[in-house]
């Protein structure tokens, strides 16, 4: 599982756009045409839940596949990762932070976002900070490896595998739009994933809550 290096590095280029937000139906085509490597199908499927042109935290962003995808949807990205080469790769389209969030101070204290995206990363002590980073009415899109993956390869340690229904327990009290735990292919892996809205904000239109 991905970790974080030490120190903090920040770079930011403010993005502005007069483009109208894409419709939910248009989002998969944007993902297919603008992003390589491809973003997670789960993130593409529920990106329409994010507030148009809203702020999004891409935590453990890796080489930025979701940063690029969400930037193409005109969101304002903050991308966090261990590797300087990873954050440098998206520094022209996002605020970037290189920080050791597992072993040093959380670099986003006092900040919250319209959406938080996390894929292929799990460090349970961060749960309270991740949840607090979502604004009331904001969206958490989370997908990572789960118990059962040990039959197919790494990660196989329980520390890095979600227990059955763990994301549902973590998001208890939130509006759960969708949840899955199962086997995916190409490559074969067992994942758990959730799309959840933090209570307290304006109600989302019913059409947006459809999977």
Segments (PLM) and residue ranges:
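A short, conserved alpha-helix within the catalytic core of class I
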Residues: 122-132
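Helix-to-beta-strand junctions that scaffold the AdoMet/dcAdoMet cofactor pocket
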Residues: 134-136
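A short acidic, Gly/Pro-enriched loop at the edge of an enzyme's catalytic core
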Residues: 106-115
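Conserved class I S-adenosyl-L-methionine
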Residues: 53-62
